[in-house]
């Protein structure tokens, strides 16, 4: 039986590729997609979900827009990474269908309520919508199998010296998720910075030769430009968000540890930092499965294999 999932995302190039991967995978049943504000404004990320589903001919999947700003802060966006539209690069279709009239939280709650089995929530943007769901519907916690997030880092941040972007945008929401008691799987920068796509990989995807693999290659062409900055020391571009879907499909290509994670919401220098108790110093019981390594070639091979689905 396919694993039921809800995807909450803020497309974003890597979010878009995560959607491509999920919808090419019969092991997963994508029951709903909700948009969060993060990589771009809430209007643009919602539009980008609709554009991607139009491209992928999946107008059957319910879509709803989420919170327009973080729980307690003003919105920060990453237009320097993802461009004016949030998906700059390829020519994507205009949306051919409309989102549902309700909110992301309402769609998530309805999906959980109606599912015969617990649902995995995959969140590849800030955690605002997921936190709102958890706070407003405690009766549905048992319907959530796990929450798989792209966010955080044990070591270095990518938006501040201490903080990864998704967590930094809404640290209060992330703290709610980590302390919810629901199993959390964290794909942080420690693993996503190892899931780099190289120039040769992009050409491999392009050579697959179907319309979707071509779009993915063009998304990556644009995404590579930001990551060429020497400060990062990257060979290619880290494909953050697809690590969440890849872990669901092939957990064996990832190395994980069970640890307690908290989110710093107050620090002068460390707001948005995910504090990972790697050496069990706090005495707190682990609340997260933390990805620490990935077989990069296995990750690339999985993407290439699933892009064949769109032939």
From Swiss-Prot:
Which keywords annotate this record?
A: Glycosidase, Hydrolase
One Gene Ontology cellular component annotation held by this UniProt entry? cytosol
Q: Matching InterPro entries, A to Z?
A: I/U_nuclsd_hydro_CS, Inosine/uridine_hydrolase_dom, IUNH, Pyrim_hydro_RihA, Ribo_hydro-like
Q: Which Pfam families match?
A: IU_nuc_hydro
Q: Which residues does the Swiss-Prot or TrEMBL record annotate as the active site?
A: 240
Question: Signal peptide position in this chain?
Answer: none
Does the record's keyword annotation contain Hydrolase?
A: yes
SUPFAM superfamilies xrefs: Nucleoside hydrolase (SSF53590)
GO BP terms: namely: nucleobase-containing small molecule interconversion; purine nucleoside catabolic process; pyrimidine nucleobase metabolic process
Gene3D superfamilies from the xrefs? Ribonucleoside hydrolase-like
In short, the EC number is: 3.2.-.-
The broad enzyme category this protein falls into is hydrolase
What one GO molecular function would you report for this record? purine nucleosidase activity
Q: Which HAMAP family match?
A: Pyrim_hydro_RihA
Q: Give the protein family.
A: Belongs to the IUNH family. RihA subfamily.
Role, per record: Hydrolyzes cytidine or uridine to ribose and cytosine or uracil, respectively.
Q: What's this protein's name?
A: Pyrimidine-specific ribonucleoside hydrolase RihA
Species: Salmonella typhimurium (strain LT2 / SGSC1412 / ATCC 700720)
């Amino acid at each position: 039986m396919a694993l039921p999932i809800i995807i909450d995302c803020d497309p974003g190039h890597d979010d878009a590729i995560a959607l491509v991967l999920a919808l090419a995978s019969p092991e997963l049943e994508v029951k709903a997609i909700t948009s969060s504000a993060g990589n771009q404004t809430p209007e643009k990320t919602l539009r980008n979900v609709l554009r991607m589903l139009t491209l992928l001919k999946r107008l059957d999947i319910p879509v709803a827009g989420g919170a327009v700003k973080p729980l307690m802060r003003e919105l920060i966006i990453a237009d320097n990474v993802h461009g004016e539209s949030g998906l700059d690069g390829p020519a994507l279709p205009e949306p051919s269908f409309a989102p549902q009239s309700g909110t992301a939280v309402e769609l998530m709650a309805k999906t959980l309520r109606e599912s015969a089995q617990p649902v995995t929530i995959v969140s590849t943007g800030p955690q605002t919508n997921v936190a709102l769901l958890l706070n407003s519907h405690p009766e549905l916690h048992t319907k959530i199998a796990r929450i798989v997030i792209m966010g955080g880092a044990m070591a270095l941040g990518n938006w501040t010296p201490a903080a990864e972007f998704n967590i930094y945008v809404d640290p209060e929401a992330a703290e709610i998720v980590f302390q919810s008691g629901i199993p959390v799987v964290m794909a942080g920068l420690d693993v996503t910075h190892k899931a780099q796509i190289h120039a040769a990989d992009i050409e491999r995807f392009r050579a697959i030769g179907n319309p979707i693999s071509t779009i993915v290659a063009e998304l990556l062409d644009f995404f590579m430009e930001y990551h060429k900055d020497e400060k990062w020391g990257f060979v290619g571009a880290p494909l953050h968000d697809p690590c969440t879907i890849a872990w669901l499909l092939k957990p064996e290509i990832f190395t994980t540890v069970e640890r307690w994670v908290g989110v710093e919401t107050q620090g002068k220098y460390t707001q948005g930092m995910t504090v990972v108790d790697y050496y069990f110093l706090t005495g707190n019981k682990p609340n997260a499965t933390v990805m620490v390594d990935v077989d990069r070639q296995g990750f690339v091979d999985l993407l290439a294999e699933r892009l064949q689905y769109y032939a």
